[in-house]
């Protein structure tokens, strides 16, 4: 048993205690620490702190000594430690005190979370309150010194609170003070000093009360009084920033609530919800059904069985796995299980090698399917290449899984591709599908590259205005022999229908692409020859057409100019079958003698006898072509030449052509007459060549629909009309046409031969927005309409029904037809206007005033159309 050790300083004297401190802190220090008086005195200070902190507490009988007294006792006790004999210790202590005041001090002004309280400390040897602070050490950073001093004095770590740019710096008495501003320190923290005999008290003080009473107290708040103003400004600024942040956060929250953003219901992605619904519905799909005749033979899941495991992993990997997408969403093509007389088959053996990460086991695949016994007739065969294993009944209980919902392995594998496809469908709008792209490409290839046989056959079939024009200048699709056997079935059947027109190309194509000047144009020549003879002087002015109104007015001034010895060349940009012929084509082919007679002023055209038919002109013009048309072509050309032109004029260019089976001919004529005339070009006195915009805006028609339109007009002349329809037709003819409201600029009007036109018609062309000053009375219209109604009520004669059968074999030797006489009547109207309007040229007439109402703009055109219609009906009803 040993005696307890006692503290050696318990009963020592002051001299023994000071000797111990001299040995500890002064004599054994490095020589460089004793190089100057200040450094040596720092070691004296450390010894004094040890005496106060430890020795004095161990031996309370020892006296309390401050630094000056302690330094005087040490120097007097051991004079060798004081190397500077010429330096008075008292003077050295004063110098050391000044040096200590020059050492920078780093501290922190600590505020709570609400910035209304500040933390202050009180020293043991001082009666004033100040910030926790301390002197900076050698080569120490300011922030590190602040953190260290605060940790020593109050025991709180400011590493996560202090900011380098938030501080207040002052120089007081030659000493630099840098106090960092810290906020957000918890007020309930238990502060405790880490050093001895240095900090006596630590308290939270109300900052606003302190700022108001700090100047009244006498030195109770050291260093705080000199920094209270900047501290107040910083606190106000921080509160303002904090208030703005709170206001912004509050406003953002309120705005989100109003807009419904940020709520839990809207946080979920609707697309993801939809995908989850689809995946859950696919995952919980009904059990697979195996049947030979699609009968609903359900698979029982009450007593699930297991499939025998594969023998080894290497053996299962040797089998080539089947693609998981091959059976996605479809029943597996496996027979009913088990099959009598056959070995056990593992239908899902391919899943083990390719999808081992999906299922729990690697050596076996379990399923909850209970395959029914083989009661239905067996129709399906086992999957070729499947591995056959013997039945191992002893392993069923070991691998029997719990009851789980039926899930197909292929469905689990295919969820990701289906989700990606659904996302692509949701992101990308669906593009319109082209149903029969091959048909359009085939037609475009036929139109762009016509064969020589098609080009040759185009000359043998006469062309009409309603036919669909091909890619070449004057050829028509009616003349091309399209092999429907090479086309798709839907295309071949649609081309065979009589009431369906197939637009083979866009009418907006350029004229340069549509013109082939070196091709023979037999059908076009036949049509042009008949048109030149029938229409007379109007065709001679087609070479002068210009798209501007100034040229149109100049043509009106030079109405007496003659164009003798000039053949007809259509140079307009119209895409119709009459205007696709180029000037080069007209010059290259041998031209026959022009059958045009230009009438001078006052001269009239001698009418031909009714016995002369228009077949002579048609056959003569067709004789110049490479082939002579057959008798059937001539007869069809006689019927199509006038009837088709009349139907084209009567029908509105803005409305699509109705089907023959849907509307009767009488109803079609009534609907046409009921429509307001949109422009003056619908007048019958102006031929189809003058209406430049008709063919550009209206779709082209096939030869099948053209023949149907010809038969429509023949049936109209043959069949008697109903009483209601005749009355409606009479009301239409007696009523003046209403203004269509369409204002047509003069710059878009084509050039019209004003010298040989009616005066009111020329005035209407020059001023399309104003009515003519001289209105034609409605008496002629009423009389003509009554006569038209009387003709329509009469039943068609037998000779009229047999008109197309009386065509002679040789059309060259026959006189002109009734169509020529009808055109002569039109020419007489052009050359010899009525006496009520024969008062001068259009230039001599006073121009219509702009203040007049345009309600009677097309009265003259309607009267002329009715007169020409009556003339055609009279001649067609006359028995030869």
UniProtKB/Swiss-Prot annotation:
Residues given in the record as Mn(2+) binding sites: 149, 153
Any one of the GO CC terms: nucleus
Keyword field: Cytoplasm, Hydrolase, Manganese, Metal-binding, mRNA processing, Nonsense-mediated mRNA decay, RNA-binding
Biased composition (Basic residues): 590-599
Gene Ontology MF terms in the entry: 5'-(N(7)-methylguanosine 5'-triphospho)-[mRNA] hydrolase activity; chromatin binding; manganese ion binding; mRNA binding
GO terms classed as biological process: deadenylation-dependent decapping of nuclear-transcribed mRNA; deadenylation-independent decapping of nuclear-transcribed mRNA; mRNA processing; nuclear-transcribed mRNA catabolic process, nonsense-mediated decay; positive regulation of transcription initiation by RNA polymerase II; stress granule assembly
Residues covered by the Nudix hydrolase domain: 101-227
Region (Disordered): 293-317, 446-485, 548-638, 736-755, 824-862
Enzyme class: hydrolase
Main localization category: cytoplasm
Compartment list: Cytoplasm, P-body
Low complexity composition bias: residue spans: 611-624, 833-855
Residue stretches of biased makeup (Polar residues): 475-485, 548-580, 737-750
Cofactor: Mn(2+)
UniProt similarity note: Belongs to the Nudix hydrolase family. DCP2 subfamily.
Subunit description: Component of the decapping complex.
Name of the protein in question: mRNA-decapping enzyme subunit 2
UniProt source species: Eremothecium gossypii (strain ATCC 10895 / CBS 109.51 / FGSC 9923 / NRRL Y-1056)
């Amino acid at each position: 048993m040993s005696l307890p050790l006692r503290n050696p300083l318990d009963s020592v004297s002051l001299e023994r205690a000071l000797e111990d401190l001299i040995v500890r802190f002064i004599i054994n220090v490095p020589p460089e620490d004793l190089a100057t008086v200040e450094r040596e005195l720092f070691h004296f200070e450390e010894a004094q702190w040890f005496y106060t902190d430890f020795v004095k507490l161990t031996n309370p009988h020892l006296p309390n000594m401050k630094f000056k007294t302690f330094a005087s006792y040490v120097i007097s006790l051991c004079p060798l430690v004081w190397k500077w004999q010429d330096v008075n210790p008292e003077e050295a202590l004063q110098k050391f005190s000044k040096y200590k005041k020059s050492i920078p001090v780093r501290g922190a002004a600590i505020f709570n979370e609400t910035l209304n309280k500040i933390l202050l400390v009180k020293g043991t040897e001082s009666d004033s309150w100040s910030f926790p602070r301390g002197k900076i050490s050698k080569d120490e950073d300011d922030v590190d010194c602040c953190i260290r001093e605060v940790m020593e004095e109050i025991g709180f770590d400011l590493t996560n609170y202090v900011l380098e740019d938030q501080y207040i710096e002052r120089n007081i008495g030659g000493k630099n003070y840098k106090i960092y501003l810290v906020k957000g320190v918890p007020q309930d923290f238990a502060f405790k000093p880490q050093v001895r005999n240095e900090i006596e008290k630590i308290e939270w003080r109300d900052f606003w009360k302190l700022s108001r009473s700090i100047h009244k107290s006498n030195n109770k708040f050291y260093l705080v009084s000199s920094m209270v103003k900047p501290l107040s400004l910083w606190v106000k600024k921080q509160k303002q920033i904090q208030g703005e942040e709170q206001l912004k956060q509050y406003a953002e929250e309120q705005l989100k609530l109003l807009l419904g953003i940020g709520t839990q219901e809207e946080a979920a992605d609707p697309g993801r919800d939809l995908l989850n619904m689809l995946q859950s519905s696919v995952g919980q799909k009904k059990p697979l059904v195996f049947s030979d005749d699609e009968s609903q033979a359900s698979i029982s899941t009450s007593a699930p069985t297991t499939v025998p495991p594969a023998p080894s992993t290497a053996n299962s990997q040797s089998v080539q796995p089947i693609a998981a997408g091959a059976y996605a969403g479809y029943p597996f093509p496996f027979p009913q299980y088990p099959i009598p007389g056959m070995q056990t088959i593992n239908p899902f053996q391919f899943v083990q090698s390719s999808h081992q990460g999906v299922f729990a086991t690697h050596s076996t695949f379990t399923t909850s399917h209970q395959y029914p016994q083989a009661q239905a007739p067996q129709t399906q065969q086992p999957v070729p290449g499947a591995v056959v294993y013997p039945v191992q009944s002893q392993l069923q209980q070991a691998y029997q899984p719990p009851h789980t919902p039926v899930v197909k392995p292929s469905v689990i594998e295919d969820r990701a591709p289906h989700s990606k496809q659904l996302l692509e469908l949701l992101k990308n709008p669906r593009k319109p599908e082209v149903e029969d792209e091959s048909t359009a490409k085939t037609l475009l290839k036929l139109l762009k590259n016509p064969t020589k046989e098609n080009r040759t056959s185009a000359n043998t079939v006469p062309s009409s205005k309603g036919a669909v024009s091909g890619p070449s200048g004057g050829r028509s699709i009616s003349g091309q022999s399209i092999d429907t056997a090479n086309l798709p079935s839907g295309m071949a059947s649609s081309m065979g229908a009589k009431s369906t027109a197939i637009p083979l190309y866009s009418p907006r194509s350029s004229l340069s692409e549509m013109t082939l000047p070196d091709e023979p144009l037999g059908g076009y020549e036949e049509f042009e020859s008949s048109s030149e003879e029938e229409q007379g002087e109007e065709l001679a002015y087609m070479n002068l057409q210009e798209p501007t109104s100034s040229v149109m007015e100049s043509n009106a001034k030079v109405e007496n100019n003659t164009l003798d010895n000039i053949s007809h060349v259509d140079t307009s940009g119209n895409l119709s079958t009459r205007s696709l012929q180029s000037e080069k084509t007209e010059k290259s082919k041998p031209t026959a003698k022009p059958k045009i007679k230009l009438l001078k002023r006052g001269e009239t055209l001698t009418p031909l006898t009714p016995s002369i038919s228009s077949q002579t002109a048609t056959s003569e013009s067709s004789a110049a072509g490479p082939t002579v048309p057959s008798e059937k072509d001539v007869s069809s050309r006689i019927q199509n030449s006038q009837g088709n032109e009349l139907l084209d004029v009567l029908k509105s260019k803005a409305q699509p052509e109705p089907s023959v089976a849907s509307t009767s001919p009488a109803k079609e004529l009534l609907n046409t007459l009921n429509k307001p005339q949109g422009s003056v070009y619908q007048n019958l006195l102006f031929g189809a060549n003058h209406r430049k915009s008709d063919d550009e805006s209206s779709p082209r028609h096939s030869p099948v629909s053209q023949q149907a339109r010809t038969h429509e007009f023949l049936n109209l002349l043959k069949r008697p009309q109903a009483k209601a329809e005749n009355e409606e037709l009479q009301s239409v003819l007696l009523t003046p046409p209403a203004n269509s409201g369409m204002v047509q600029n003069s710059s878009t009007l084509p050039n019209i031969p004003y010298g040989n036109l009616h005066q009111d018609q020329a005035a209407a062309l020059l001023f399309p927005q104003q009515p003519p000053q001289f209105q034609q009375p409605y008496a002629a219209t009423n009389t003509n309409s009554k006569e038209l109604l009387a003709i329509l009520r009469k039943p068609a004669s037998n000779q009229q029904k047999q008109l197309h059968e009386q065509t002679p074999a040789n059309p060259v030797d026959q006189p002109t037809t009734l169509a020529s006489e009808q055109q002569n009547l039109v020419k007489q109207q052009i050359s010899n206007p009525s006496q009520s309007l024969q008062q001068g040229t259009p230039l001599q007439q006073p121009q219509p005033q702009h203040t007049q109402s345009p309600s009677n703009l097309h009265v003259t055109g309607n009267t002329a159309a009715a007169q020409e219609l009556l003339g055609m009906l009279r001649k067609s009803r006359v028995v030869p």
